[in-house]
């Protein structure tokens, strides 16, 4: 049950983005299209899971005064590995993500889970916690990217889903909502998701 909670809790009840309000900056940068959002979410999940695993394995041998430095070194090493992997196998997406892959090092979700969970729990539990929080983060990125790409470009994962015949230029009634491609719309969509989520979860509402 504990393992299941580690995986499913961050998807909704304890989501790192819409409940803990962490990792918001990525929602602006990489959610114009679903493909880079998916790759960024997957990258953060891998880094979070393995950072948790490594730090949980090392937790009893690290002096508390240097633990932050060790955490940063571990996270940075994992991010470099992920970055090189993306450049080798999905170069086009890597170019779209640009510097934002490197900025995973500064993602509050990763450091937060290492500090709050991995340093006090067993390796396997910590690994699952990282997977769960990564999935929760990726889910929000994909939801935001879904609306931005669909209404801003008329496509999903780069595939046109709104028929050309619908567009005004072809005698139809529809026109892409260009404002959806601007960064502020990502925050507005995240805000809407938070509002809907809290409306259905009374425990999260402030008294």
Give names to the regions the model predicted.
Residues 62-75, 96-102, 129:
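Cytoplasmic-side transmembrane-helix entry/capping segments in multi-pass membrane proteins
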């Amino acid at each position: 049950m504990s393992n299941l909670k580690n995986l499913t809790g961050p998807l909704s009840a304890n989501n790192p983005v819409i409940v803990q309000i962490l990792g918001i900056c990525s929602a602006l940068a990489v959610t114009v299209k679903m493909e880079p959002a998916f790759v960024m979410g997957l990258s953060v999940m891998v880094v979070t899971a393995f950072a948790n695993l490594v730090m949980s394995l090392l937790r009893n041998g690290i002096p508390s005064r240097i633990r932050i430095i060790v955490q940063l070194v571990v996270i940075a090493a994992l991010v470099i590995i992920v970055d090189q992997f993306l450049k080798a196998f999905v170069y086009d997406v890597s170019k779209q993500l640009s510097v934002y892959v490197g900025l995973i090092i500064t993602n509050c979700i990763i450091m937060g889970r290492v500090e709050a969970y991995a340093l006090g729990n067993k390796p396997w539990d910590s690994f699952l916690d990282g997977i769960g929080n990564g999935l929760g983060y990726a889910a929000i990125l994909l939801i935001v990217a879904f609306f931005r790409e669909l209404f801003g470009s008329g496509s999903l994962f780069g595939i046109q889903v709104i028929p050309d015949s619908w567009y005004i230029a072809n005698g139809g009634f529809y026109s892409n909502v260009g404002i959806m491609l601007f960064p502020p719309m990502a925050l507005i969509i995240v805000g809407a998701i938070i509002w809907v989520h809290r409306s259905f979860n009374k425990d999260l509402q402030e008294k």
